[in-house]
Each structure stands twice: as structure tokens, then as C-alpha cells.
Amino acid sequence: RGLGDVYKRQALLFAAALTAQAQQGGISGEMLNQIKQSYKATPADKAIRNALGGTSINTLALNQENRADFDTEFSHKVLSKGITDQQSSGRCWLFTGLNVLRSQMIAKYGLDEMEFSQNYCFFYDQLEKANLFLQGIIDTSGKPMDDKMVEWLFKHPLSDGGQFTGVSDIIEKYGLVPKSAMVETFSSENTGKMSSLIGLKLKEFGLQLREAAATGAKPAELEKKKTEMLGTVYRMLVLTLGEPVSTFTWSLKGGEAKEYTPVSFYKEFLGNDLTNNYVMLMNDPSREFYKCYEIDFDRHRYDGKNWTYVNLPIEDIKEIAIASIKDSTM
């Protein structure tokens, strides 16, 4: 028997295997043939395939004719002095919050430009979220692994996303620094890989904490282990984002340079009580309007505030947004 017979037998076995799978909802050989035959290799398909082979789908999907249709003229503008770019990161919430403060400082001191370090705030955001996870694991160590809260914790050990409560909680505790004091890095602009690696390490730590608690570790021992684990997370953050400054020298244009800590800098130039002077407004049609809602354990700091918002109709939010823009307060 030649190789041809061997290949035929293998093909028959493959088809038989596919047929067996079909009995359990799989793709049979007959079904696979129908699927293959349904594809018609048209000249247009060939052109699309060649284009997709070397070009991003997002680039190809852009309608070039629409690029000139955007009207960039506005009746009112906020004194932002340029844009800020979150790059390929999930820090939209942080950029938005810092832009509110940025416009206030530009207007207050008549600055030509100003930008706060998003990287500085993000560093402590990730460290605080790591602690939030680990402490959550300690708090639920007496519950089974299939408990809904435990399951949720291990599914969401760390993220780069957030909302304004996180901005206020991080700044309240750690202050602010100018962007020049802690610049962006590749990982701060591309947060996905860094956050996923730290998340994997946190899951490992979470299992270790649960095991320690199950074998009788006292609260003080668990606290010690958690602190050591956060030391590892801190090192990972330093390697990817850089180490946050504790002091720096800065001055307003034409002013005398002074040394600041991040907290003293924030208090001197802004000093706004973000925790008590601001409230999140949201439009959630699935819940009753004109009420305040709080999402449990959805926060950035263990000792911080939960995601809390006032639910308003979209018409009310539009009016407030317009008034804010006109007042240049964002």
C-alpha cells in the first residue's frame, strides 16, 4: 500500500471523528464541507484579504470622506491650553479628573500651559488597588472559594479603569505633581500588559493568603504577609512606571522656585476638597432618578469611598455640563 492509501484512511478517520462530534453538537465533515463551499473567493475578497494582511482593521474601516465633515468651531471653550493623551491605556477617568484641576489652575494663575503627572497618580492608584484586593481576600478568607464575593475578587484583582471617586481619593492621600516631576513611560501609556502581570501575581498572593488563614494564621501574620506582597507589587510598579518623587522643585512662570512635597504642592496651588465638594452625576435610566446610589466595594482605596453617584435625567446633565463649560470649570 502506498502513501495515498494511508492518507485516505487518515482522512476517513478524521471525517468519522467529525461525524461523532456532530452527534454532540460538533461540526461534522458534511457540515464543514457546506461551510467551506459557502465561501466564494470574489475579486473583492482577494483585495480585502491583501489589505488586511498588512494593515490595521481600524485604519481600513475609516471613511476618509467623513474626515473633513467635523466642525471644530465652538461657541464656548474651556481654558485647557491643549489636549492630554492617555495613549493605549485605560486611564480615561484619571485624565478627565486631572483635566478639571488643570483648567482651574490655568485660569487661576493665567498660565500658558500646565499638565499634572498622570503617571504619578496612576502609580498609587495601582498600589492602592492591589491593597484593596489583598485586604478583600483577608476579609473573605473564611468564605468558600465559590462564594460570589471571593469569585468576584479573583476575577477582578486589578484594573487600570476607574471613575472620579478614585481621582479624589488618590489626590487626597498622595497629592499631585507637575508632569515634569514624573513623566510617562511605555507601560504608563500601554497599561494592559503591566496590569495583567500584576493581576496574575495578586491572584497568586490571594491564594497564599487564603491558605495561611486556613492554617490558623493570626490577623497580624496576615497583615505582615500582605505588606511583604505589596512590596513586590511596589517593585513591579517602580520597574514599569518609575519611582514616585517625594519632593521636587517647581515655580510659577517668573516666580521663585520652591521645594514641594506632592501634598503641599496640591494644597498651595489648588487645595480643593475633591471628596466633599464634588459629586458624580450619572444617567442610569434603569434606576429611579434624583436619588443617590452607591456601588459596594467598587473603589480605588480600601479606606476610600465607594463609587457614589446622583442619578439624573440626561437633560439635567446636559444643562449642568453647558453651565460648567461656560464657567470654564469643566
For the regions a language model picked out, list residue spans one by one.
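Structured alpha-helical subdomains that flank or immediately precede key functional sites
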Residues: 22-88, 94-330
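Solvent-exposed, well-ordered amphipathic alpha-helical segments
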Residues: 8, 21-22
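Short, small-residue-biased leader/transition segments that mark boundaries at the very start
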Residues: 1-7
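N-terminal signal peptide c-region/cleavage motif recognized by signal peptidases
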Residues: 15-17
